[in-house]
Amino acid sequence: STWSQVATDIMVSKYFRKAGVPQVDEGGKALKDENGDVVLGPETSSRQVFDRLSETWRHWGEETGYFATKKDAQAFEDELKYMLATQMAAPNSPQWFNTGLNYKYGLEGPAQGFWYVDPKSGKLTEGKDSYSRPQPHACFIQSIDDDLVNEGGIMDLWVKEARLFKFGSGTGTNFSNLR
């Protein structure tokens, strides 16, 4: 009841996942079709979005040893849900769009050329799909070489920008190297 109509419209139109989400009944039991397959559809409530984000952030924290106890992890998750629901905090758009789609719903997509630092090995690793290690950052400053077709050049910049734009990020570029 504290959300304005504009905030509600943005949440529903921009941040609710539109497809691939397991549908559940009022008791939380998965709905199945006549073949026994889980029915997939959109997110239908803000609570689903808040759960998707906060449970994933908690999972990542537990996975990397961030919390001293399970109680600390639960408090973190509960406080995040409260802050999101009351609009005390809000992540950037790529977080709303991408975070938790794999962890919460098991969604995968084709690898898109994203890389991440593996928390266990500390090594740069290419992502195996689009959502298990999503690209959650909002803004990137890129450089460009004075070259049309080779790596680091003008056409390569287009590819890098497309990868970032696809998942909701934005970019700026330092063009000072161009003639």
Label the predicted regions.
Residues 1-179:
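Extended catalytic cores of very large enzyme megasubunits
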